[in-house]
Design a protein with these regions (language model features):
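Short beta-strand elements
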Residues: 98-116
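Glycoside hydrolase catalytic-domain context in secreted enzymes
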Residues: 1-73, 82-96, 116, 120-564
Length: 564
């Protein structure tokens, strides 16, 4: 057991004590932070590692290391992440129920690790539970383990404070007065992407910031709003292809691999043959006859295990390999963005999409999403869209529900997994959720999409809405009750940094254009959204010179595992 101001490192031996079967085991490392001015849980997961397949009698040494700073808690009064003074007990086991104390880390002074600002003020402050006056959990022998634990002093002054610099409203890009710029000009270094964007009209940028569909009609139910790949969820625009060489990209849903229509028919002109009812087509493709001169196509994709099952493996190498499988098929079907992984917290077992999400633990969720993303983004020009950002923890009234969450709970539970995924994998995109948090639609939340994701975590890709977020869907989903909250708006999506609105509709474009005209939407903000979308598009597999998206970033590690 070792620890300093930078890392906590645990080395454990795993042995198969059976005499018949080979097997694997997981080593889990927890920490118990001291109660100072902030109450703490009994223990929190700090790191984990999975052994190789061990034969009877075989053993393996596993070393697990995680940043000391990751044990910090969020202090709402200080608007900062803090390591409070006291003793941090490190516990090791193969589950949260079997941990034993391995060491005691002593921090003499409270340290602010990150100084930021509160972003999620409560609109209806919940009554928080307290453990004051409650006998703390313990087990036989715990006191003796603490007394005998290895004592390690951590240097308080060696831990430096990071101060977040928050961005301001972007200024309009300086106008490029030269000839009309193209993607080739940007790629060759003749001009910058900002130069190109400065030449775009408001109408062009409003189109760039929307998908190519005309609203969320029946086809939206089956995620089939793409004009390019049957069954794919949607496309970015090709309006800039003819004169600027900027291709469109295709987005396909998940979660168990690529969700495409496995069987479809086109006529002699290359148009899909349809019964006229998209829902009927989705379930009765085999009944559609092939017309004279037509062609029958098959595009079957591999079904990988769903997220909840993958997380139960505790095997990040396995999850990365599953991402690699999806990445190879994205290349085959020319899909640029996989609308997965979903990584919301398992808050309630009644959530209808829990199978799509990894865990109730934010570290597990974040590491799984990062492993999946790294597997996919090891392929050139493709990426993931981690979702649903954030606090999408129920399906009932998911479009209009308002989640009341404290600042600390938001950061330590509901955002922590997304933060880990961004810092350790840099997903190409993030998908915002339908719901509100503390009275603000997540799709319209500048504090969530820009201040947290970009300013605090360094997210570099673009943010998209979930399908139909900025449309009025109360009639489409036949809600029978009065809605307290309306839907998010296109103008506020752009203001928040929600760059791409999907699946796109004319009303979204018109609202953006009108808002720039009346001065309620700064031109620089629209240009910035268009820039972020095109920056990703120009790195997509639509171009022969594309590279693995993640290669350009200096990625962190939430947990480092080595085996011997």
């Amino acid at each position: 057991m070792e620890a300093d101001d930078k890392n906590v490192t645990v080395t454990a031996s795993v042995k198969n004590i059976g005499d018949t079967f080979a097997g694997k085991e997981v080593v889990q490392v927890y920490y118990s932070a001291p109660d100072g001015t902030i109450e703490k849980p009994y223990q929190e997961l700090g790191g984990f590692g999975k052994s190789d397949l061990l034969s009877p009698g075989e053993s393996q040494t596993i070393t697990i290391s995680f940043p000391t700073r990751s044990m910090a808690s969020y202090d709402e009064k200080k608007a900062a992440w803090v390591l409070e003074a006291g003793t941090y007990y490190i516990r090791v086991g193969n589950s949260s129920r079997t941990t034993k104390v391995a060491a005691a880390l002593n921090l003499k002074e409270t340290v602010v690790t990150v100084q930021g600002k509160n972003l999620f003020p409560a609109d209806d402050a919940p009554q928080e539970l307290s453990k004051a006056g409650v006998t703390p959990y313990s087990y036989e022998g715990e006191a003796e383990e603490k007394a005998a634990a290895k004592q390690i002093d951590i240097c308080s002054k060696c831990i430096k404070t990071e101060t977040v610099v928050y961005s301001e409203t972007p200024e309009a890009f300086p106008a490029y007065e030269g000839e009309k710029l193209t993607a080739a000009d940007v790629k060759s270094g003749k001009a910058t992407l900002k130069d190109l964007v400065s030449q775009l009209t408001v109408e062009e940028m409003a189109t760039v910031c929307n998908g190519t569909a005309d609203g969320l009609g029946q086809e939206g139910f089956i995620g089939s709003s793409s004009d390019m790949a049957p069954g794919a969820a949607g496309d970015t625009t090709s309006i800039l292809l003819a004169d600027r060489g900027i291709y469109n990209t295709i987005l396909a849903d998940g979660p168990a691999g690529l969700r495409l229509i496995p069987h479809f028919v086109v006529d002699a002109d290359g148009k899909m043959v349809s019964s006229g009812n998209p829902l009927e087509d989705a379930f009765n493709k085999n009944e559609i006859e092939v017309p004279e001169g037509g062609t029958e196509y098959f595009q079957y994709c591999t079904a990988i295990p769903v997220a909840a099952l993958l997380a139960q493996s505790w095997n990040m190498d396995l999850i990365r390999k599953c991402g690699d499988i999806v990445g190879k098929e994205m290349e085959e079907f020319h899909i640029s963005v996989w609308l997965a992984p979903g990584m919301n917290i398992h808050r309630n077992p009644l959530c209808g999409r829990n199978f799509e999400y990894y865990s109730e633990d934010p570290l597990v969720a974040g590491m799984c999403a990062a492993a999946d993303t790294r597997g996919i983004q090891s392929h050139a020009g493709i990426g993931t869209s981690i979702k649903h950002f954030a606090a999408n923890n129920q399906e009932d009234n998911r479009m209009y529900v308002n989640e009341h969450i404290s600042e600390r709970a938001m950061r330590e539970i509901y955002l922590k997994g997304f933060e880990i995924a961004v810092k350790t994998a840099q997903p190409m995109t993030i998908m915002s959720s339908y719901n509100l948090v503390n009275g603000v639609h997540t799709a319209n939340s500048h504090d969530l999409l820009t201040a947290a994701a970009r300013d605090e975590w360094g997210f570099a890709g673009y943010v998209m809405t979930d399908w139909g977020t900025s449309e009025d869907m109360s009639g489409l989903f036949a809600y029978k009750y009065n809605l307290k909250y309306g839907h998010s708006t296109s103008r506020e999506c752009v203001l928040a940094g929600n760059d791409l609105q999907m699946p796109g509709q004319q009303g979204n474009r018109q609202e953006i254009i009108a808002s720039v005209a009346d001065g309620t939407l700064p031109l620089g903000q629209l240009q910035t959204c268009a820039y972020r979308i095109l920056n990703v598009v120009l790195q997509s597999l639509a171009y022969d010179d594309c590279k693995p998206y993640g290669d350009q970033f200096d990625l962190e590690e939430a947990v480092t595992v080595t085996k011997a």
